[in-house]
Amino acid sequence: MVQLPAMKRVKGRAPLSVVVAIIGGLALAGIIFTEDLRGLTEVKEKVTDKEKKRTSLRTVMRTSALLSADQPPPPAVLSVEPATATPPPAPKMAFNATRCSVTDGYWAYDRSKKLPYTDQTCPYVDRQDSCQRNGRPDSDYLYWDWHLDDCLLPRFDPVSMLEKLRGKRIMFVGDSLQLGQWLSFVCLVNSAVPDTPGAKSMERSRTLSVYTVKEYNASIEFYWAPFLVESNSDRNIALGAGGRVLHVDAIEEHGKHWRRADILVFDSYVWWMTGYRIKSVWGSFGDDGYEELDAWVAYRLGLKTWANWVDSNVDPATTRVFFMSISTTHMRSEDWGREGGIRCYNETWPITQRGYRGSGSDRRMMEVMSDVLGRMRTPVTLLNITQLTEHRVDAHVSVYTETGGLLVTDEEKTDPQRYTDCIHWCIPGVPDTWNRLLYAHL
């Protein structure tokens, strides 16, 4: 019997099932290792990014510290995103009467501004308004300009203004505030007129005053009519407020002087605001009795009489008509936070709060004014000076004025409660800005 030789076992060789299991295990381990490695790599990248940001932040902080110490920055390139540049403010457009708001603006101080005149160089400024000549010690109030938010308000150009007035009459009509605007206008124009004999002339009277410039055949006039309608105090100015009687439906005695003017500039407000009810009559002053009306009721009647006269007598093709809004008074220092103050006395700086409104302008009267003007057939431009005057508590004549025709004395100045005038304005001063608005509209 032949025996077959025995088979030899090969070392290290495993059964196929074992091999397959081992290979599968190795593959799974490889996958797990790869995922772990990827995770470790991502963490490392995140840490690296954070470190980069920290490094950049530290670099910026060091640079800021160096800059604040007035030292040059290190020569390193900062790894930060560029800052977004702030766009420059939009350029203001040239003044356009229909698109520009004269009430949206602010007062800016400019000590370098050259004054076109002073109360010493212009011989026509009344003593009542000559603050510097009357001894006012400060002058900052002279160097503020009204800037519009969106538009450029042009400077008053006296030569250009005279060209506009060549062969024409401009007449200012109203009360003592309007008289101040007229004087300001005259002084602005006069700054461009030579002081040669016959080049100009001035005639003053209680009712009508006329400044003429011969070369331009231009006439700049003022007519006194504080209520616009007729009253028993038109000529008797010294008559007390309680004794005034208005003829609310009569105006022709005044109106006959306004005809044939090329430009009419009206104002009427402060004389209505005495605190008294307005004694009003219809028909002749000789009639017995009168009716006492609230100021705003009488004001509406008077303005309607004026509006009817304008609509009946003014040709819009040949005459421009303007109406000045309320010139603000400053009678309550509490309005602007000056507790214990005496009205505008010793105020040397404007109120800078945007849109400030105090108690010195009656809104109901303003509404009456706007309503009457809005119903007229004749185009009338309302020059809204109310907001810009609200801020100028510093620019009134205060105690540097006259009262009863006499200059306030040094002794009287020690009693500001009695002698401070916070209605009228120093000239030069705020009325020059009113005339800038007028010039811009012309």
Swiss-Prot record:
Pfam families: PC-Esterase, PMR5N
Residues in compartment: Cytoplasmic: 1-13
UniProt key word Disulfide bond: yes
Membrane topology term: Single-pass type II membrane protein
Disulfide bonds: 100-151, 122-187, 131-426, 344-422
Top-rank taxon: Eukaryota
Alphabetized InterPro entries for the sequence: TBL, TBL_C, TBL_N
Glycosylation sites: 96, 217, 346, 384
EC number: 2.3.1.-
EC primary class: transferase
Keywords annotated in UniProt: Disulfide bond, Glycoprotein, Golgi apparatus, Membrane, Signal-anchor, Transferase, Transmembrane, Transmembrane helix
Motif GDS motif in this chain: 174-176
Annotated Gene Ontology cellular component terms: Golgi apparatus; Golgi membrane; plasma membrane
UniProt-listed PANTHER family: PROTEIN TRICHOME BIREFRINGENCE-LIKE 3, PROTEIN TRICHOME BIREFRINGENCE-LIKE 9-RELATED
Function: Probable xylan acetyltransferase required for 2-O- and 3-O-monoacetylation of xylosyl residues in xylan. Possesses extremely low activity in vitro.
Family, as annotated: Belongs to the PC-esterase family. TBL subfamily.
Protein name: Probable xylan O-acetyltransferase 8
Organism taxonomic ancestry: Eukaryota, Viridiplantae, Streptophyta, Embryophyta, Tracheophyta
